[in-house]
Swiss-Prot record:
Binds 1 [4Fe-4S] cluster. Its EC number is 7.1.1.-. NCBIfam families: nuoB_fam, PRK06411.1. This is NADH-quinone oxidoreductase subunit B. It catalyses: a quinone + NADH + 5 H(+)(in) = a quinol + NAD(+) + 4 H(+)(out). The gene is nuoB. InterPro entries: NADH_UbQ_OxRdtase-like_20kDa (IPR006137), NADH_UQ_OxRdtase_20Kd_su (IPR006138).
């Protein structure tokens, strides 16, 4: 967190930095595991790699999640349901495309396979591989945290516009925090 400690031991920061810190260190992913990438995702959540140590708790409901991890092949019949899950997630939300199938349709593109989930929902991080390793997923999640910290995810700013309207200008500029 970009903050400073003054002579009295208080930390001063801005509201945006505080919200960014909280968001990036408490990501709650909902998963769409459609193929072999889902096995690697489960492996990343198990005791050897323990994704929970990064502050991530998998959620079963999209209404309680802020990160969508799509792992595996998305066929055209599943695409509307994937869009529905994305629309049910509250803002700010982010998406990770895990594996070659979710990112580009897989090694054998067919008429029934969606050629990348970025055709229907915005993707923030792509994780390559067939299937990607658990280390690859963890690296992708750390990259998402870095993007949130550096505010390279534009939907993040849009999500707090209503919140910022209710605050006084002094708080928004970091004075009095």
């Amino acid at each position: 967190m970009a903050s400073s400690i003054n002579g009295n031991g208080f930390i001063t920061t801005t509201v945006d930095e505080l919200l960014s810190w909280g968001r990036r260190n408490a990501l709650w992913p909902v998963t769409i595991g459609l193929a072999c990438c889902a096995i690697e995702m489960m492996h990343a959540a198990a005791s050897r790699f323990d994704i929970d140590r990064l502050g991530m708790i998998f959620r079963a409901s999209p209404r309680q999640a802020d990160v969508l991890i799509v792992a595996g092949t998305v066929v055209n019949k599943v695409a509307p349901m994937l869009k529905l899950v994305w629309d049910q997630m509250p803002e700010p939300k982010w998406c990770i495309s895990m594996g070659g199938c979710a990112s580009a349709g897989g090694p054998f593109p067919t008429y029934s396979t969606l050629q990348g989930i970025d055709r229907i929902i915005p993707v923030d991080v792509y994780i390559p591989g067939c299937p990607p390793t658990p280390q690859g997923l963890i690296y992708g999640l750390l990259e998402l945290q870095r993007k949130i910290r550096e505010k390279k995810v534009t939907r993040y700013e849009k999500a707090f516009e209503e919140f910022k309207k209710d605050l006084s200008p002094e708080l928004l500029n970091g004075v009095g925090v």
